[in-house]
C-alpha cells in the first residue's frame, strides 16, 4: 500500500466516522472552513485596495497571497472543506473504502455548511470600519465583475484547474514531512489558482457574500441570483 493510499484511507475513515457520530460537529468544522476562507478573502480585499493606492499592479499579487493563507488555516485547524473532501472521498470511493452514496451525502452537507460559515463571516465583516468604506473601485467589485462576466465554458474549465491546484496543495501538505515545506506548497499552489482568477466554489461563496452584504454591489450590473448560480 502506498503512502497516498494510507493517508487517504485514514482520512476517509476519520471523516465518515465524524459524520456518522455527530452531524453537529461536522457542520461546525465545515462552517469554520468556510469562515477561514472568508477571513482571508476579506483581508486580501482590503490589502489589495490599500496597495492599489500606491502600486496598482501589485493588487492581484497581494490578494492571491493573503487568500492562500486561508487554506493553511483550514489544514492546520482541521476544517472540513468541500473541495479538499472531493479529493479524499472520491479517492476513497474509487478504492472501495467508502460508498459513493455516502460520498455525495457528505459533500453536499459539507458544501452547505461551508456556505453558512462564509455567509456569517461575510455579514460580520460588512459591519466593520474597513468594509463600510469600500468604493466602486474596490478590488472586490473588480473581482466579482470578472467572475460573473465569464462564459459557462470558462467556469467549467477553470473549476477543474482550480481543483487541480487545490489537490496539489492538499497532497503536498499530506505527504511532505517538513512543516515549512508543507506550508510553502500549500501557499504556492493556492496562490497560483487565485492569481489566474480560476473558479473555486467556496472562494466564490466568500467573495459573493462579502459583496452581497455591501452597498457597492450596485456597481456590479450582472450581480443577480441567476448569474451567481450559473
Protein language model annotation of sequence segments:
Residues 1-230:
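Alpha-helical transmembrane segments and their helix-helix packing motifs
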Amino acid at each position: 500500500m502506498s503512502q497516498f493510499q494510507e493517508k487517504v484511507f485514514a482520512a476517509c475513515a476519520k471523516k465518515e466516522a465524524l459524520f456518522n457520530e455527530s452531524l453537529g460537529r461536522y457542520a461546525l468544522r465545515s462552517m469554520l472552513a468556510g469562515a477561514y476562507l472568508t477571513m482571508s478573502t476579506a483581508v486580501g480585499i482590503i490589502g489589495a485596495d490599500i496597495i492599489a493606492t500606491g502600486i496598482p499592479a501589485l493588487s492581484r499579487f497581494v490578494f492571491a497571497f493573503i487568500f492562500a493563507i486561508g487554506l493553511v488555516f483550514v489544514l492546520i485547524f482541521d476544517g472540513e472543506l468541500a473541495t479538499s473532501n472531493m479529493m479524499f472521498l472520491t479517492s476513497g470511493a474509487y478504492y472501495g473504502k467508502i460508498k459513493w452514496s455516502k460520498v455525495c451525502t457528505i459533500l453536499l452537507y459539507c458544501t452547505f455548511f461551508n456556505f453558512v460559515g462564509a455567509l456569517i463571516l461575510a455579514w460580520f465583516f460588512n459591519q466593520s470600519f474597513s468594509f463600510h468604506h469600500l468604493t466602486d473601485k474596490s478590488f472586490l467589485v473588480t473581482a466579482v465583475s470578472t467572475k460573473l462576466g465569464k462564459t459557462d465554458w470558462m467556469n467549467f474549465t477553470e473549476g477543474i484547474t482550480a481543483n487541480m491546484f487545490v489537490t496539489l496543495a492538499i497532497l503536498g501538505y499530506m505527504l511532505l514531512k517538513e512543516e515549512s515545506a508543507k506550508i510553502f506548497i500549500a501557499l504556492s499552489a493556492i496562490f497560483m489558482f487565485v492569481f489566474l482568477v480560476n473558479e473555486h466554489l467556496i472562494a466564490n461563496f466568500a467573495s459573493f457574500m462579502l459583496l452581497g452584504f455591501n452597498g457597492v454591489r450596485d456597481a456590479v450590473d450582472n450581480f443577480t441570483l441567476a448569474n451567481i448560480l450559473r
